[in-house]
Regions:
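Bulky hydrophobic/aromatic packing residues
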Residues: 31-32, 39, 51, 67, ...
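A beta-strand edge to alpha-helix "cap/lid" segment located at domain peripheries
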Residues: 2-16, 80-167
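Short, low-complexity N-terminal intrinsically disordered segments enriched in polar/charged residues
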Residues: 2-37, 41, 45, 49
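A solvent-exposed, acidic/Ser-Thr-rich amphipathic alpha-helical stretch
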Residues: 44-110
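Charge-dense, low-complexity intrinsically disordered segments
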Residues: 18, 22, 64, 118
Length: 167
C-alpha cells in the first residue's frame, strides 16, 4: 500500500466515523422529539419502546423500571385525564454527547395544559437521558427528570456539561 493510498484510507475512515456520529446524534434527537407526540397521543406501546427493556424513568418521585411500567404510566387514568383535556409535552433542544454505544443528553421540557380557551404551563423541568445503542437502534437506558424549581437537583442536571465548558 502506498503512502497516498494509506492517507486516503485514513481520511475516508475519519469521514465515515464523523458521519456515524452525526447519524447517531440525529437518531437520538429524533427519539427525544418523538416522546411528546407519542405520550400526548396516548401511544403507550410506542412510548414504552423508546426505552431499553431494562430502562428506567425517574421523575418527581415516580420511579418506573422497564417498558411495562412506562406503558402503564401512559395508560394510567391520571395521564389519560391530562391528554383528553389537551396537553403538550414539549421537549426543548437537547445537548447530546456520544461515546461509542452510549450517549448522554440533557434538555428542558414544558408540560402545557389546556385550561378553557387558554393554555397554561403546568410544569417546567430538566431531563438527563442516558442512552444505549442496541441491535435495533438507540433507546433510553435511564431518564431522570427534575422540576425547575430552583433546587440543587435541577441545577445539577442542568450543569451536566458545564465542566466541559470550563475546560
Amino acid at each position: 500500500m502506498t503512502e497516498e493510498h494509506s492517507m486516503a484510507t485514513d481520511a475516508l475512515d475519519e469521514i465515515l466515523s464523523r458521519l456515524r456520529r452525526v447519524e447517531d446524534e440525529l437518531a437520538i434527537t429524533r427519539l427525544i422529539a418523538s416522546y411528546g407526540p407519542l405520550v400526548d397521543s396516548g401511544s403507550a406501546d410506542a412510548t414504552a419502546q423508546l426505552w431499553c427493556a431494562d430502562g428506567e424513568y425517574e421523575v418527581e418521585g415516580w420511579n418506573m423500571r422497564g417498558r411495562d411500567e412506562v406503558r402503564a404510566m401512559v395508560e394510567s387514568s391520571a395521564h389519560r385525564k391530562l391528554i383528553t383535556g389537551g396537553s403538550a409535552h414539549f421537549q426543548g433542544p437537547a445537548r447530546v454527547d456520544i461515546d461509542g454505544d452510549s450517549a448522554l443528553a440533557v434538555f428542558e421540557s414544558l408540560l402545557v395544559l389546556r385550561d378553557g380557551d387558554r393554555f397554561q404551563v403546568l410544569r417546567a423541568s430538566v431531563h438527563r437521558l442516558q442512552l444505549r445503542r442496541e441491535a435495533d437502534g438507540w433507546h433510553i437506558a435511564r431518564r431522570t427528570g427534575r422540576l425547575l424549581d430552583g433546587g440543587a437537583e435541577a441545577r445539577e442536571l442542568l450543569a451536566t456539561f458545564a465542566q466541559e465548558q470550563d475546560d
